[in-house]
Amino acid sequence: MQSDVTPRDEKLHVGIIMDGNGRWATRRGLSRVRGHEAGVEAIRRIVEAAPKQGIGTLTLYAFSTDNWRRPKAEVAALMTLLRFYLANEVQSLVRNGVRLNVIGRRDRLPEGIATAITRAEEATARGSTLHLRIAVDYSARDAILNAAAKAAALTSLTREAFSQLVTGEAGLRDVDLIIRTSGEKRLSDFLLWEGAYAELHFTERMWPEFDASDLAAALASFHGRERRFGGLQAIMPEEVPSLSRV
């Protein structure tokens, strides 16, 4: 049986739905693109803070399959930012021991970005301080559906094997905590399989504002919770009623 409380020395898997870039910018009279640029700065802050706060795997929701519906100019700007991040952050990631993986579809990304992703993944493959996963053109339901299609050809299947089909990785730790910024309270098709028992933390802070202290607050809340994984809290012997007293 899994422990009710996650040990603080155990490396966590945290997912973050990075929401609120556009609203942050609009409230300041700035373009939505400027909000996304500020969001990249927040990514840098949190990637630096995560290992120091006990996070071993960090999955960031950058672009969902539904985000293609946004205005073309905004989508183009987001793809430019992704290209810029891949080109300019790799050396910093390598220097800090960060291993990068990009999850989601790659066949619909603009020309050159898929190649840049592969190069960044190869360059950071030896990183062991933090496993950074960035979800781009990602849908958890599509990931599960694709895994089910592959599993249909198998004669036997375990939960661990199916999990590898969903995530594309063997031995990936289930998500411990999902954080969503901007005050919205929904998962938006993010990590539905690997986050089945994840704790949820919602904050009013917009993503460009989110910093190490906000991450620490979310983790403090997480560590104060009892995680029962579908079971019951352990009952002490003295709490069990005696038949003689019934």
Where are the language model's segments positioned?
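Flexible, compositionally biased loop and terminal segments
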Residues: 1-246
